[in-house]
Amino acid sequence: MKVSSSVKADPSKGDKLVRRKGRLYVINKKDPNRKQRQAGPARKK
């Protein structure tokens, strides 16, 4: 999974934007290896 500060989804390749637990993910059913997650604030310990 690629983690970047801004995610870009390409619907023509089957990408879908999903928000889970306050984070933005790009998932793809056609190409399951094509995943992205938007980097949020660092985790508190």
Curated annotation (Swiss-Prot):
GO terms for biological process: translation. Residues 1-45 are annotated as: Disordered. One of its GO terms (molecular function) is structural constituent of ribosome. GO terms for cellular component: ribonucleoprotein complex; ribosome. It holds the Pfam family Ribosomal_L36. The keyword Ribosomal protein applies. The keyword Plastid does not apply. Belongs to the bacterial ribosomal protein bL36 family. This is Large ribosomal subunit protein bL36. It comes from Chlamydia pneumoniae (Chlamydophila pneumoniae).
